[in-house]
Amino acid sequence: SAASDVYKRQDYGGANVAKPLHVGHLRSAVIGESIKRIGKFMGHHMIGDVHLGDWGLQMGLVITGLQERQPDLVYFDENYTGEYPEEAPFTISELEEIYPCASGKSKEDEEYRNEALEATHQLQQGKPGYMALWNHIMQVSVTDLKRNYANLNVSFDLWKKESDAQPYIPDMVQKMKDQGFAYEDQGALVVCLLYTSPSPRDS
């Protein structure tokens, strides 16, 4: 039938790793799961995607917060060239404590926030120690998220992440610059989304 030939991809997770789920995630998960089931009942091929937030400032905050608590961990040794531990240096309970503490401190301490921003940048540039920590954060968080979603009877076909888009970003940024969509403003590369607002170049 025509309905069975239609593919629907539904993003209804939106959880952030290293952070606990809250009531907003409950709403989107239940509504999304309902839409997916209704679509399947109607004959559509539905694909559920959790779409994890794993590549933003919260990662830099966790890394900075962990370094403040355990500065002697091998992940922070600039001269270390060996294999990193397979077991995470934190539990999910500790991880969920690190983030809010680091986030709160970053709002009061500009230097601390800048350290977290730099840690985020270094992670996104592939710094080995930070990538190893990111893998630990992902493993611990996803295990806990799957347990929580299972308790809600919510399931996903795909566990895609923000970081999955990283390989495409450099070319996309260059294309936006080449085509005049992106411009620098106060040291940041900006894309104006309001088409009625002229670019600074036009003023």
Where are these regions (language model features)?
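NTP-dependent nucleotidyl-transfer catalytic core
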Residues: 1-203
